[in-house]
Amino acid sequence: MANNSREHLARDLFRRYEGNPILEAKDWPYPVNSVFNPAAIKLPDGTLLLARVEDLRGFSHLTLCKSKDGLSNWWIDDKPTMEADHESHEERWGLEDPRIVWLDEQGQFAITYVSFSEGGPLVSLAITKNFHTFARMGAMLPPEDKDACLFPRRFNGRFALIHRPIVQGEAHMWISMSPDLKHWGDHRVLMRTRHAFWDGQRIGLACQPIEIPEGWLIFYHGVRATVAGQIYRIGVALLDLEEPWKVLRRSPEWILGPRADYERIGDVSDVVFVTGATVNKESDLLYLYYGAADDKIAVAIANMSEIREYIMMCPEAED
């Protein structure tokens, strides 16, 4: 049943930064086709993005970008920061769609990303302390798999990974557990697509999990097929704080979708694809960084207090 007050709040949760798009191919210091789907993390001296960059052959790599305010005056690495090892079966056709978390226990950043292998897309892991050198840990799970990120801490001694395998042709979100970041098990479906809804064809994790007092905020993308093509929009769910395989609430409606021209026109039309987020605790602002129409980067801004209010207005998740 519709909830008018919740739907009004959902419609107005995010505002687009007036300087969008914040990064485009024309800003790059070397020739590229497109830039999109960045991982994001807030550091003491500003915001760091690890952007997906598609070269003129159609292969993707990752490039570092930095900004003091997370919005403007971006420094961009003058060469690819992470490139595929084309001699590796795992990374034969490029690296895509990274997410970043800080692992307190290890004192390092964990980057999950999509490697395009000979067997299809799969999820890989790299560890770094400085974003200059990277320890590539290899594939985490077999293909076909995408849209993955670790939680920043363990649960009962185990790491948790949200990811989106394709199982029997269906694209639901799963969660898996590991004692050591190498051996994964206890696989279970976390969230399913919803037939006839805006997220009825495919879903996948958006940015990294965000811890709030009520639980873990999980932003995710949903896809709906229309006669004119697919539409990628963003929703949100709330997971239990200590048992993140339990979904507490889930938004019935989308909260961010393609509306601006730069989101509706590009390499792939009608796409808002979030892969990174930062939270400013002093201003209570959430920045969602996203690929717009698969060829540029934009940011949407919301108040965390309103996000928390909204998710608690959403219905409890069905088992």
Locate each region found by the language model.
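Acidic-residue sensor for enzyme active/binding pockets
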Residues: 96
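Beta-rich carbohydrate-recognition and catalytic domains
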Residues: 1-93, 102-201, 210-270, 281-319
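C-terminal substrate/ligand-recognition segments
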Residues: 275, 279
